[in-house]
Curated annotation (Swiss-Prot):
EC number: 2.5.1.78
Record keywords, A-Z: Riboflavin biosynthesis, Transferase
Family: Belongs to the DMRL synthase family.
The protein's name in its UniProt record: 6,7-dimethyl-8-ribityllumazine synthase
Database matches in Pfam families: DMRL_synthase (PF00885)
GO biological process: riboflavin biosynthetic process
Residues annotated to bind (2S)-2-hydroxy-3-oxobutyl phosphate: 86-87, 128
Source organism: Campylobacter hominis (strain ATCC BAA-381 / DSM 21671 / CCUG 45161 / LMG 19568 / NCTC 13146 / CH001A)
List of catalytic residues: 89
Catalysed reaction equations from the record: (2S)-2-hydroxy-3-oxobutyl phosphate + 5-amino-6-(D-ribitylamino)uracil = 6,7-dimethyl-8-(1-D-ribityl)lumazine + phosphate + 2 H2O + H(+)
Gene name of this polypeptide: ribH
Binding residues for 5-amino-6-(D-ribitylamino)uracil: 23, 57-59, 81-83, 114
SUPFAM superfamilies: Lumazine synthase
Gene Ontology MF annotations: 6,7-dimethyl-8-ribityllumazine synthase activity
Amino acid sequence: MNTIEGKLTLTGKEKIAIINARFNHIITDRLVEGAKDAFMRHGGDEKNLSLILVPGAYEIPFALDLAIKSSKFDAICCVGAIIRGSTPHFDYVAAETAKGIAQTTLKYGIPVSFGVLTTENIEQAIERAGSKAGNKGFEAMSSVIEMLNLYKNLKA
Protein backbone atom coordinates (compact mmCIF):
# COMPACT_ATOMS: atom_id res chain seq x y z
CA MET A 1 0.00 0.00 0.00
CA ASN A 2 1.23 3.47 -0.88
CA THR A 3 0.89 5.94 2.00
CA ILE A 4 0.62 9.63 1.21
CA GLU A 5 1.06 12.14 4.00
CA GLY A 6 2.40 15.60 4.61
CA LYS A 7 5.70 16.15 6.33
CA LEU A 8 6.10 18.42 9.30
CA THR A 9 8.77 20.62 7.71
CA LEU A 10 8.93 23.95 5.96
CA THR A 11 11.44 25.15 3.37
CA GLY A 12 11.38 28.72 4.68
CA LYS A 13 9.53 29.97 1.60
CA GLU A 14 5.99 29.17 2.71
CA LYS A 15 3.80 32.12 3.63
CA ILE A 16 1.49 31.36 6.51
CA ALA A 17 -0.92 33.61 8.39
CA ILE A 18 -2.22 33.26 11.91
CA ILE A 19 -5.70 34.71 12.39
CA ASN A 20 -6.10 35.53 16.07
CA ALA A 21 -9.27 36.54 17.89
CA ARG A 22 -8.26 39.18 20.46
CA PHE A 23 -11.19 38.48 22.81
CA ASN A 24 -9.81 36.51 25.77
CA HIS A 25 -6.38 37.82 24.76
CA ILE A 26 -4.71 36.43 27.88
CA ILE A 27 -5.38 33.01 26.36
CA THR A 28 -5.12 33.82 22.66
CA ASP A 29 -1.76 35.59 23.02
CA ARG A 30 -0.37 32.29 24.31
CA LEU A 31 -1.92 30.41 21.39
CA VAL A 32 -0.23 32.81 18.97
CA GLU A 33 3.12 32.28 20.71
CA GLY A 34 2.63 28.51 20.41
CA ALA A 35 1.77 28.80 16.72
CA LYS A 36 4.79 31.02 16.07
CA ASP A 37 7.02 28.57 17.96
CA ALA A 38 5.80 25.66 15.81
CA PHE A 39 6.31 27.69 12.62
CA MET A 40 9.90 28.51 13.55
CA ARG A 41 10.77 25.02 14.87
CA HIS A 42 9.61 23.41 11.65
CA GLY A 43 11.77 25.61 9.43
CA GLY A 44 9.65 28.69 8.80
CA ASP A 45 11.16 32.09 8.06
CA GLU A 46 9.68 34.73 10.39
CA LYS A 47 9.39 37.26 7.55
CA ASN A 48 6.87 34.86 5.93
CA LEU A 49 4.64 34.67 9.01
CA SER A 50 1.78 37.18 9.30
CA LEU A 51 -0.57 37.87 12.19
CA ILE A 52 -4.11 38.99 11.37
CA LEU A 53 -6.04 40.28 14.38
CA VAL A 54 -9.82 40.23 14.66
CA PRO A 55 -12.02 41.33 17.59
CA GLY A 56 -13.46 37.91 18.42
CA ALA A 57 -13.83 34.35 17.21
CA TYR A 58 -17.04 35.12 15.31
CA GLU A 59 -15.05 37.38 12.98
CA ILE A 60 -12.46 34.71 12.11
CA PRO A 61 -14.36 33.23 9.11
CA PHE A 62 -14.73 36.63 7.45
CA ALA A 63 -11.04 37.45 7.93
CA LEU A 64 -10.19 33.97 6.67
CA ASP A 65 -12.21 34.55 3.51
CA LEU A 66 -10.44 37.88 2.91
CA ALA A 67 -7.00 36.41 3.61
CA ILE A 68 -7.52 33.55 1.16
CA LYS A 69 -8.88 35.89 -1.53
CA SER A 70 -5.77 38.06 -1.15
CA SER A 71 -3.64 35.14 -2.45
CA LYS A 72 -0.88 36.22 -0.04
CA PHE A 73 -0.78 33.00 1.96
CA ASP A 74 -0.10 29.32 1.33
CA ALA A 75 -1.90 28.25 4.51
CA ILE A 76 -3.71 29.82 7.46
CA CYS A 77 -3.81 28.90 11.15
CA CYS A 78 -6.89 30.15 13.05
CA VAL A 79 -6.73 30.58 16.83
CA GLY A 80 -9.11 31.94 19.41
CA ALA A 81 -10.78 31.15 22.72
CA ILE A 82 -14.50 30.82 23.28
CA ILE A 83 -15.26 30.26 26.96
CA ARG A 84 -18.72 29.28 28.13
CA GLY A 85 -20.59 31.87 30.17
CA SER A 86 -24.04 31.85 31.71
CA THR A 87 -25.93 32.56 28.46
CA PRO A 88 -26.36 30.57 25.23
CA HIS A 89 -24.03 33.03 23.43
CA PHE A 90 -21.18 30.48 23.67
CA ASP A 91 -23.14 27.88 21.69
CA TYR A 92 -23.92 30.26 18.84
CA VAL A 93 -20.43 31.72 18.57
CA ALA A 94 -18.69 28.33 18.81
CA ALA A 95 -20.97 26.71 16.22
CA GLU A 96 -20.86 29.56 13.72
CA THR A 97 -17.10 30.00 14.04
CA ALA A 98 -16.44 26.30 13.42
CA LYS A 99 -18.94 26.16 10.57
CA GLY A 100 -17.60 29.35 8.97
CA ILE A 101 -13.99 28.15 9.08
CA ALA A 102 -14.92 24.75 7.66
CA GLN A 103 -17.06 26.20 4.86
CA THR A 104 -14.41 28.73 3.88
CA THR A 105 -11.70 26.07 3.87
CA LEU A 106 -13.71 23.81 1.58
CA LYS A 107 -14.78 26.72 -0.64
CA TYR A 108 -11.21 27.71 -1.51
CA GLY A 109 -9.30 24.49 -0.97
CA ILE A 110 -6.23 25.77 0.81
CA PRO A 111 -4.93 24.36 4.10
CA VAL A 112 -6.51 25.94 7.17
CA SER A 113 -6.29 24.73 10.75
CA PHE A 114 -8.78 25.14 13.59
CA GLY A 115 -7.06 26.18 16.79
CA VAL A 116 -10.06 27.86 18.38
CA LEU A 117 -10.55 26.67 21.94
CA THR A 118 -14.11 25.98 23.06
CA THR A 119 -13.97 25.45 26.80
CA GLU A 120 -16.33 25.28 29.74
CA ASN A 121 -14.23 27.63 31.88
CA ILE A 122 -11.08 29.74 32.02
CA GLU A 123 -9.12 26.96 33.74
CA GLN A 124 -9.63 24.63 30.76
CA ALA A 125 -8.56 27.41 28.40
CA ILE A 126 -5.37 28.04 30.40
CA GLU A 127 -4.58 24.31 30.36
CA ARG A 128 -4.85 24.25 26.56
CA ALA A 129 -2.84 27.42 26.03
CA GLY A 130 0.47 26.14 27.30
CA SER A 131 0.13 24.35 30.61
CA LYS A 132 -1.21 20.84 31.37
CA ALA A 133 -2.75 20.06 27.98
CA GLY A 134 0.02 21.55 25.83
CA ASN A 135 -0.46 24.50 23.53
CA LYS A 136 -3.25 24.14 20.99
CA GLY A 137 -1.78 27.03 18.97
CA PHE A 138 1.38 24.96 18.50
CA GLU A 139 -0.75 21.97 17.50
CA ALA A 140 -2.85 24.01 15.06
CA MET A 141 0.25 25.37 13.32
CA SER A 142 1.77 21.89 13.17
CA SER A 143 -1.45 20.60 11.60
CA VAL A 144 -1.54 23.31 8.95
CA ILE A 145 2.12 22.70 8.06
CA GLU A 146 1.43 18.99 7.63
CA MET A 147 -1.70 19.69 5.57
CA LEU A 148 0.17 22.20 3.39
CA ASN A 149 2.72 19.51 2.53
CA LEU A 150 -0.03 16.94 1.93
CA TYR A 151 -1.75 19.46 -0.34
CA LYS A 152 1.48 19.90 -2.30
CA ASN A 153 1.94 16.12 -2.59
CA LEU A 154 -1.59 15.48 -3.82
CA LYS A 155 -1.72 18.50 -6.11
CA ALA A 156 1.53 17.61 -7.91
